[in-house]
Amino acid sequence: MTTGLDAELIEQGRKLFAGEWQFIWASPSIETLPPMSGLEVAFAGRSNVGKSSLINALTGRSALARTSRTPGRTQELIFFEGPKGVDVRLVDMPGYGFASAPKARIASWTSLIHQFLLGRATLARVYVLIDARHGIKDIDKTVLGALDRSAVSYQVVLTKADEVKVTEMAERIDITRTQLASHPAAFPDVLVTSSRTGNGIPELRAAMARLIGDHRR
């Protein structure tokens, strides 16, 4: 389901997440962001698309990022840092598309995300998580367009793949790739994951290892 990820990259990805990752910062506003350091990789997506679960699966820590059945619980930019020597941070962004949240809160989240994307020189890529069962929705298209306009590199990750029939997944990947073809800031490869089964997690780690290696050359 992914391309160009050989055994060496898979091993680099494993090593990237072999050490202990930890929570370091929560930012409710742009003024409270941590100082820029190393590289940052952010995770965006609709409420309850599985961002926190994916971060937990990547790091091998079941409770590093707090998960909730309540949509819209993550209202801050949550930063996690790798072990000494890795010099990489993961950023769990507020979920979008939660219509029941107060309008003022939605506006605050939107402003925070927009300012973060525009002003973060250490941001290497945003992984936009899309529920594999539902595909790219209108609210996702709005976010992808904003990333294009901000010239922020991003890559789509289909989540909850275990809830889609194997016979249907190839078509869903093709549809997603076709939809992304018109987005200039989108990385062409579509990643497929399941936090519950672990499928696709080694490939996502490998993709991140390649990204980090490219930025450090």
From Swiss-Prot:
The gene is engB. GO terms for biological process: division septum assembly. One of its GO terms (cellular component) is cytosol. This is Probable GTP-binding protein EngB. Keywords: Cell cycle, Cell division, GTP-binding, Magnesium, Metal-binding, Nucleotide-binding, Septation. GTP binds at residues 45-52, 72-76, 92-95, 159-162, 193-195. InterPro entries: G_ENGB_dom, GTP-bd, GTP-bd_ribosome_bio_YsxC, P-loop_NTPase. Mg(2+) binds at S52, T74. It comes from the Bacteria. Belongs to the TRAFAC class TrmE-Era-EngA-EngB-Septin-like GTPase superfamily. EngB GTPase family. The keyword Transmembrane does not apply. The lineage of its organism: Bacteria, Pseudomonadati, Pseudomonadota, Alphaproteobacteria, Hyphomicrobiales. Residues 37-214 form the EngB-type G domain. It holds the Pfam family MMR_HSR1. One of its GO terms (molecular function) is metal ion binding. Necessary for normal cell division and for the maintenance of normal septation. Its cofactor is Mg(2+).
